[in-house]
Regions:
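GST-like domain detector, emphasizing the conserved glutathione-binding G-site
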Residues: 1-115
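GST-like fold's C-terminal all-alpha helical module
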Residues: 88-195
Length: 199
């Protein structure tokens, strides 16, 4: 599932809203999705009645407007919330998602689709999967940044209540899929004999 779709699911839960979802294909073609969105290919998409909202940040604003309590973008902290969310959805999320290249988690058609639209030409995907050590350091650095924001004892990144910044920083959606691979990587790094283990 898309990490941004995961964020919107969490947002709906924080607000205590009843909702339904549909799964769309990860790669083209997406005929039902395109018909709904007028050609917009990304997820998530929010439908409220006859209105369709694309873009995660817009969806958060719409949810806050339609259901103000609790606010996902706290009044007076909108700029900070947006900055932290943007950081979490780029720097932090991208390093987590880089692990998806390890072990062929994604279907070949998905990788081909993303190579056409998101990955710069000439990117060595196989080589990228060999730089696990540096990616683990980046993950640790990002987690330390988050911990630094919480050093003063606050419960959440922007204060005492959960915000969209927290939901963006929570990487449980994508991380649950790479957890086993990360564990395996640590085993291989710490116990070279594990590489030769039968089975």
């Amino acid at each position: 599932m898309s990490p941004l779709a995961w964020k919107i699911r969490l947002s709906l839960g924080v607000k205590g809203l009843t909702w339904q979802s549909v799964q769309t294909p990860m790669s083209l073609p997406k005929p039902d999705h395109f018909e709904l969105t007028g050609g917009y290919r990304r997820v998530p998409v929010l439908q409220v009645g006859a209105d369709i909202y694309c873009d995660t940040h817009l969806i958060i604003r719409v949810l806050d407007r339609l259901h103000p309590s609790p606010p996902l973008s706290p009044p007076g902290q909108e700029t900070v919330e947006h900055a932290v969310s943007r950081w979490a959805e780029t720097s932090f999320m991208m390093v987590i998602l880089s692990f998806f290249g390890i072990g062929g988690i994604f279907a070949e058609d998905f990788v081909e689709d993303r190579q056409k639209t998101m990955i710069p030409p000439g990117t060595d995907l196989e080589g990228a999967s060999r730089i696990v050590g540096s990616k683990l350091i980046q993950i640790r650095n990002n987690i330390e940044r988050l911990e630094g924001m919480l050093e003063d004892g606050r419960s959440f990144l922007l204060g005492d209540t959960v915000s969209a910044a927290d939901l963006s920083a929570y990487q449980g959606g994508p991380a649950q899929y790479i957890d086993e691979q990360l564990r395996q990587e640590f085993v291989i790094r710490n116990r070279p004999g594990a590489r030769c283990a039968p089975g």
